[in-house]
């Protein structure tokens, strides 16, 4: 067993396997560190920077879950910084060394539980990094702005998505605007700044899927939108739609 496996994209043959960590849902990210390609993988036990050709770890940093491996968000890389957010285990900022193949922790904020949170306790949504600030959705739908240098909360907005456990917004940057699809199927266009969520237009474009849970009677849209050729592509469990923008 292995947490990460590389396959030949033409034949599907296995090229290498790496790490004995538990797996989870987060996608790997390919970045540069000191001129070398590094595959950043957030596993069920920590974060690793791998040589993408061989799978050999350049570095590893622990981020063990207090309950279960449940990370879905993709690691957010900005320069030599790596930001991670977990529903139960809060937010962590790492820094990749610019002189060696190493990494160090800058800060880690975690609240006492999923309702009393510090930093950002996100489950599905990948945050977005703009300038010196991070924006993401906390455990019960709180849209938050954090100062990237130390994780301090700058503001919180409760209007972007309904207050529910695991509430989700997908963020896509487009120039000075951010396009946001919330789990009610509403597409929002606005500006995320340290002053707040500004100038938001909002329209329901996809019907949420029903879930067999008491707190989700209205359903959810958890699939990420895709943007291409001035169109947005969206899906639920019943249909795939394309909307001209």
What are the roles of these predicted feature ranges?
Residues 1-245:
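Noncatalytic, solvent-exposed loop/strand surfaces
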């Amino acid at each position: 067993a292995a947490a990460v496996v590389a396959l030949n994209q033409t034949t599907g043959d296995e090229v290498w396997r790496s790490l004995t960590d538990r797996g989870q849902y987060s996608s790997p990210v390919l970045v540069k560190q000191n001129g070398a390609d590094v595959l950043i993988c957030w596993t069920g036990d920590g974060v690793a920077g791998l040589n993408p050709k061989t799978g050999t770890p350049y570095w590893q940093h622990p981020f063990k879950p207090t309950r279960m491996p449940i990370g879905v968000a993709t690691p957010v890389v900005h320069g030599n910084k790596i930001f991670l957010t977990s529903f139960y285990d809060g937010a962590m900022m790492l820094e990749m060394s610019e002189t060696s193949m190493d990494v160090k922790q800058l800060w880690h904020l975690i609240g006492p539980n999923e309702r009393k949170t510090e930093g950002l306790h996100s489950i599905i949504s990948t945050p977005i990094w703009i300038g010196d600030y991070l924006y993401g959705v906390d455990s019960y739908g709180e849209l938050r702005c954090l100062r990237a240098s130390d994780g301090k909360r700058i503001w919180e907005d409760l209007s972007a998505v309904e207050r529910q456990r695991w509430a989700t917004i997908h963020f896509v940057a487009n120039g000075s605007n951010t396009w946001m699809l919330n789990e009610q199927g509403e597409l929002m266009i606005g500006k995320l700044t340290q002053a707040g969520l500004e100038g938001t237009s909002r329209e329901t474009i996809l019907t949420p899927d029903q879930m067999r849970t008491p707190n989700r009677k209205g359903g959810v849209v958890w699939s990420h939108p895709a943007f291409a050729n001035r169109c947005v592509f969206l899906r639920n469990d019943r249909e795939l739609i394309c909307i001209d923008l």
